[in-house]
């Protein structure tokens, strides 16, 4: 790109100079990735992140956000290494236990949902580390991950239109 710059005196318009330069903009292929829980909480780096408690049969969603910080469109391949079944979803595109290719325009971001089904036969304390690899076409790979661990989560569901009054240490049955 050729650029021309004219500088003129404010006191004497007959004094001026014209400078020309050729400017070349280099291609930038910078990008970043981040993963979030289904409630929008950033999970951070795998080595520092807390384990995510899950239950048998639960569908766990992890959202991968890829941001193209460069100045050219970029093509990526996303894959998940996981011993439990996974599904990648981006818009109308869906891939089960495979790789997904996506294109992202310069300055834009794209979100991919990674669904994992926790096996019904898994035992309390079993864990699975899900590794998400985002590879820029013919270039670098960024790796994100999260660890899912099966835990017993105590919960209490009540259905009553009023209050339930129970003395400390006693039990009560409501119908």
Where is each model-derived feature located?
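Intrinsically disordered, low-complexity Pro/Gly/Ser/Thr-rich segments with frequent PxxP/GP/PP motifs
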Residues: 1, 93-120
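Short glycine/proline/serine/threonine-rich loop/turn segments at secondary-structure transition edges
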Residues: 1-3, 120-129
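Short aromatic-centered micro-motifs
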Residues: 67, 88, 122
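Short acidic, flexible loop segments centered on an aromatic residue
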Residues: 69-87
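Long, low-complexity ectodomains and other extracytoplasmic segments of secretory-pathway proteins
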Residues: 9-72, 125-127, 134-175
């Amino acid at each position: 790109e050729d650029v021309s710059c004219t500088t003129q005196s404010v006191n004497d318009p007959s004094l001026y100079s014209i400078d020309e330069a050729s400017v070349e903009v280099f291609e930038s292929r910078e990008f970043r990735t981040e993963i979030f829980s289904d409630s929008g909480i950033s999970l951070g780096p795998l080595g520092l992140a807390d384990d995510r408690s899950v239950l048998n049969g639960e569908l766990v969603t992890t959202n991968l956000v890829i941001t193209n910080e460069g100045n050219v469109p970029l093509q990526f391949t996303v894959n998940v290494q996981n011993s439990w079944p996974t599904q990648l979803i981006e818009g109308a595109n869906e891939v089960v236990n495979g790789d997904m290719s996506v294109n992202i325009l310069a300055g834009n971001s794209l979100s991919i949902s990674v669904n994992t089904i926790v096996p019904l036969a898994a035992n309390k304390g079993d864990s699975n580390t899900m590794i998400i690899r985002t590879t820029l076409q013919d270039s670098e790979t960024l790796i994100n991950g999260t660890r899912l661990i099966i835990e017993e989560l105590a919960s209490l569901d009540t259905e009553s239109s009023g209050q339930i009054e129970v003395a400390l240490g006693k039990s009560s049955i409501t119908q």
